[in-house]
Structures are given as structure tokens and as C-alpha cells.
Regions:
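N-terminal intrinsically disordered, low-complexity, charge/repeat-rich segments that act as generic
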Residues: 1-18, 31
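...with weaker cross-activation on analogous glycine-rich loops/strands in unrelated enzymes
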Residues: 4, 43-108, 113-114, 134
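Conserved catalytic core of Hanks-type protein kinase domains
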Residues: 9, 34, 93
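Glycine-rich, flexible loop/turn motifs
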Residues: 11, 21, 41, 109
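Short, hydrophobic secondary-structure boundary micro-motifs
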Residues: 17-19, 43-44
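Active-site nucleophilic cysteine motif
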Residues: 18-38
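Residues that form or immediately flank small-molecule/cofactor binding pockets and catalytic motifs
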Residues: 20, 104, 130
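Glycine- and charge-enriched low-complexity intrinsically disordered segments
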Residues: 116-134
Length: 134
């Protein structure tokens, strides 16, 4: 099993559209940072202030860099539909049923995937093809 690099120093960091750290992140920027800490270069997709554009960018890139899986492992990307019509959010699975993420009005947090608010919004689990075998 892979081990997600320590991320406790990221908890509480603020949200910023297009944020790639070190002081602020958007949801995909946080994923990029976690992969960087694990020694992996996650491809960065053009960030935009339009949440629909962010989701579309990831989904287009996912075809080349990620494979959809059914059971999450550490460092898998979980996509969520938080807006009514499209996928617009992601988090990184950190094990034990938990994921780390950030949203526009929520600083970096680690939450339980099984809570109703997140469980019914999940739209897919994606594994980066560049991850070493588990």
C-alpha cells in the first residue's frame, strides 16, 4: 500500500481559484501538491474561474493520464458533483475511508467519504497511470 505524504501542514489553508500553493489552493491544485510531495508529477490542467471549465479540463485529461477504478486506494482522485449539472470538485483519497480537499468556502480539510453529503455526490474514482504498482 502506498502512503500519502504528510499533509497536516496543509489543513486550514485557504481556497483560491487557480491556487497551486504554497499558501492557497483550489481543489485540483491541492491534488497536484499532494502528488508532488509523493514524488510524482501530476499533470496540471488549465485552471479557470468557471467550475464547469475545471471539470471539463480534468475529464479531458483523465482520458490520457488516469484510469477509472471502483475501489479507492491512497492518492486516487475522487470526483464530485457539487453543482447541479456537472462535475466540479475533486479530492484525494488518503486511506481509511477519508479524503482531503478544499472548496471555495471551506479551507483544506480531511473528511469521511461515507457521510451522506459526500457519498451521494461521488461521480468517479480515478487512479493516476504514473503511480507505482501497489
Amino acid at each position: 500500500m502506498r502512503h500519502v505524504p504528510l499533509y497536516t501542514d496543509l489543513l486550514g489553508k485557504p481556497f483560491e481559484y487557480g491556487g497551486r500553493g504554497p499558501d492557497a489552493f483550489d481543489c485540483y491544485g491541492l491534488a497536484v501538491e499532494l502528488y508532488r510531495r509523493a514524488g510524482l508529477a501530476l499533470p496540471d490542467y488549465a485552471s479557470t474561474d468557471d467550475p464547469a471549465g475545471q471539470g471539463a479540463g480534468f475529464m479531458h485529461g483523465a482520458e490520457h493520464h488516469f484510469q477509472q477504478v471502483n475501489i479507492p486506494q491512497e492518492l486516487d482522485i475522487i470526483l464530485f458533483q457539487v453543482l447541479p449539472r456537472f462535475v466540479s470538485h475533486c479530492g484525494v483519497y488518503v486511506g481509511h475511508g477519508r479524503f482531503i480537499h478544499i472548496m471555495s468556502k471551506i479551507s483544506v480539510a480531511c473528511e469521511d467519504l461515507a457521510t451522506p453529503i459526500w457519498q451521494h455526490r461521488q461521480r468517479g474514482i480515478y487512479r493516476f497511470k504514473g503511480l507505482p504498482h501497489a
